Every structure is written in structure tokens, then in C-alpha cells.
Swiss-Prot record:
Pathway: Purine metabolism; IMP biosynthesis via de novo pathway; 5-amino-1-(5-phospho-D-ribosyl)imidazole from N(2)-formyl-N(1)-(5-phospho-D-ribosyl)glycinamide: step 2/2. The lineage of its organism: Bacteria, Pseudomonadati, Pseudomonadota, Alphaproteobacteria, Hyphomicrobiales. It comes from Rhizobium leguminosarum bv. trifolii (strain WSM2304). Coiled coil: none annotated. InterPro entries: PurM-like_C_dom, PurM-like_C_sf, PurM-like_N, PurM-like_N_sf, PurM_cligase. This is Phosphoribosylformylglycinamidine cyclo-ligase. Its EC number is 6.3.3.1.
Length: 357
């Protein structure tokens, strides 16, 4: 027999608070408005987000799409109760994948799933997403908040992001003229970024340190805060360098898999990247992780960015111009190596020198 009247069940009794969802929408509206750009000036709350490509200034665009998440870095945010920056990570993981194809990020949508919705926590997360969108120059045009009791424990949540960008036809990267002798430039990362955090968490567990302990590699910060340093967003400096110099042949976002998995994705089969490990300036966090976890160099290189979050391939005669354009926008640029001939079946990344950890 079904229940009715004041004894009947409600959605709230099942663990879903519609009022909390509505409150969250009101809390995040100012942050969402702050991401408006040409092509996107609507309000959230409709059934779909709109974007006007003509208003964005494109003539014959090719759309480029990417989606990603933040992985178990979220577990540190949850355990440390620090939610302000994981939204930046979410945006970064998507828009950095767009810019490596020469695309300008246009708009972003997020998916936020939780066991029990906390409007203040949700507003902090979406505030970070909006901050990432502002850094990337893309509009946050919509999203989905899913309260799912029974699927997630109270306090737990997961994030997914979806970004769409565009490039004029014929301007996509990588270009078809990558050649032996071309130079590989590395752009410094801000830290661990958003990959390898299952290993990071295992190492922290072995260390016996709590998230509130001073970070051994950054004594002015707590361990949780230091590890949650957001992923660097390279979009605006790279787009400016691409447009000003016209000399960037390829870009690779150094995420899970490190150099050996990510650099070959943008290279022709007959070329390999020769990396001088002595040129890699690994921040102290990586030395601490390697030392504390007894992680071998090979494993570090295929798990973490080790201090290089993005690489660019340019002809040797254009190194100075591209480096100057990037450095003018605040990037730290190092010469990492060069393109060499690659035999059939050989590795797409080879190393010289030693990584200082």
C-alpha cells in the first residue's frame, strides 16, 4: 500500500534535497556570470547552453572537444576539507588538451556528483571551475549537479568536465612539418597537477603525515594544501605564442604517462623525442615523493610530469622567438631536447642525462 498525506515519503526522505540544489544555483550565478565572453552571454538554468561562433570571431572553424576529470586528487580535497581549487584542475585538464591542438577554448560544462549536497562546498567547487574558465578565456555555460545517496558516501563527490574549442581550418596542431633536429621546449608545471595521485596518497600514507602537517617540501604550507596546488593552465600564453610567431609545430600536455606516453602522441612515426633529463628542473615535491616512496626514476617519469607540464616543438631558428613570447606571458621555458630519427618499433621518447631528484 502506498503512503499518502503527511505520512507519505518525500524526495528529501530518500536523501535528495531539491531546495539545496536550488540554493547552490543561486550561490554560483555570480561566478558563472564572471566567465562570460564573446559568443556566450546567457544565464545558467536553461535546458542547454548556447554559444555563437560568429560572435566569437571565427570564419571557418573546426570544433575540438575534450573531457576529463581530476582523479583521486579529489580524495585529498575531501579529506583536507579544501575545495576551492579542484575546479581549476578540472578546467585545466580539459582546456590544456584543447590548446595542444591549436584550439581556443570557447565553453565549458561540468558534472558534479555527490552523496549529499552541501551548497557551500558546491559553491566553492564551482567557484574554482569559474576561476579556471576565466584563466582559459572560456565561458561556463552549464552543468549538472547530481545528488546521489547510496552511490556516494556523505561528503564524497566526483567531478567531470567537458570543454569545446575551435581553430580556423588549416590552423590545427600538430603541423605536418615536424623534422629531425627540431627543438623540444618545456614549460614548467605548478606541481603534481592532476595525475598520479593514487601513488601520491600511498606515499603520504607511508610517511605517516596528516594533511594538516607542514609540507616537507614547502614548509610554509600544510601538506594537503601544497599537494592541492592547482594544475597550470597554459592556454593564453600558448595561444599568443602560436598567433604571434606562427612557429609552434606541436604541443603535448604532459599528464598521466608522463613524457613516454604523451610526447609520441603528437609525433610522426619516423621521429622520436630525445630528452635531456639534466635540463628538467623537478620541483621539491617530486624529490620528496621519490625519496619517501622509494620510487625509481623510470616510474617517476611515466607517472608524473616531473616539473614539465607542457612541451612545444619548434624549429631551431625559432627557439628564441617562441621562448620570448612565452616568457613574456609568465611561463618558465627550458630547452629539453630535440627530434631524432626513429626506427620502426622503437620508443617514441629516449633519454639522455640524469633526472635530479
Amino acid at each position: 500500500m502506498s503512503q499518502s498525506g503527511k505520512n507519505g515519503l518525500t524526495y528529501s526522505d530518500a536523501g535528495v534535497d531539491i531546495d539545496a540544489g536550488n540554493l547552490l544555483v543561486e550561490k554560483i550565478k555570480p561566478a558563472v556570470r564572471s566567465t562570460r565572453r564573446p559568443g556566450a552571454d546567457g544565464e545558467i538554468g536553461g535546458f542547454g547552453g548556447l554559444f555563437d561562433l560568429k560572435a566569437a570571431g571565427f570564419n571557418d572553424p573546426v570544433l575540438v572537444a575534450a573531457n576529463d576529470g581530476v582523479g583521486t586528487k579529489l580524495k585529498i580535497a575531501i579529506d583536507a576539507d579544501y575545495h576551492d581549487t579542484v575546479g581549476i584542475d578540472l578546467v585545466a585538464m580539459c582546456v590544456n588538451d584543447l590548446v595542444v591542438q591549436g584550439a581556443e577554448p570557447l565553453f565549458f560544462l561540468d558534472y558534479f556528483a555527490t552523496g549529499k549536497l552541501d551548497p557551500d562546498q558546491g559553491a566553492a567547487i564551482v567557484g574554482g571551475i569559474a576561476a579556471g574558465c576565466r584563466q582559459a578565456g572560456c565561458a561556463l555555460i552549464g552543468g549538472e549537479t547530481a545528488e546521489m545517496p547510496g552511490m556516494y558516501s556523505s561528503g564524497d563527490y566526483d567531478l567531470a568536465g567537458f570543454a569545446v574549442g575551435a581553430a580556423e581550418r588549416g590552423k590545427l596542431l600538430p603541423s605536418g612539418d615536424i623534422a629531425e633536429g627540431d627543438v623540444i621546449l618545456g614549460l614548467a608545471s605548478s606541481g603534481v597537477h592532476s595525475n598520479g595521485f593514487s601513488l601520491v596518497r600511498k606515499i603520504v600514507e607511508l610517511s605517516g603525515l596528516g594533511w594538516d602537517a607542514p609540507a616537507p617540501f614547502a614548509s610554509d604550507k600544510k601538506l594537503g594544501e601544497a599537494l592541492l596546488e592547482p594544475t597550470r593552465i597554459y592556454v593564453k600564453p600558448l595561444l599568443k605564442a602560436i598567433r604571434e610567431t606562427g612557429a609552434i609545430k606541436a604541443l603535448a600536455h604532459i599528464t598521466g604517462g608522463g613524457f613516454p606516453e604523451n610526447i609520441p602522441r603528437v609525433l610522426p612515426k619516423h621521429l622520436a623525442a630525445e630528452i635531456d633529463l639534466a635540463a628538467v628542473k623537478a620541483p621539491p615535491v617530486f624529490s620528496w615523493l621519490a625519496r619517501t616512496g622509494g620510487v625509481e626514476t623510470k616510474e617517476m617519469l611515466r607517472t608524473f610530469n616531473c616539473g614539465v607540464g607542457m612541451i612545444a616543438v619548434v624549429a631551431s631558428e625559432n627557439v628564441a622567438a617562441v621562448s620570448a613570447a612565452l616568457e613574456a606571458e609568465g611561463e618558465t621555458v627550458v630547452t629539453l631536447g630535440r627530434m631524432i630519427a626513429r626506427d620502426e618499433g622503437a620508443a617514441g621518447t629516449v633519454y639522455q642525462g640524469t633526472l635530479a631528484l
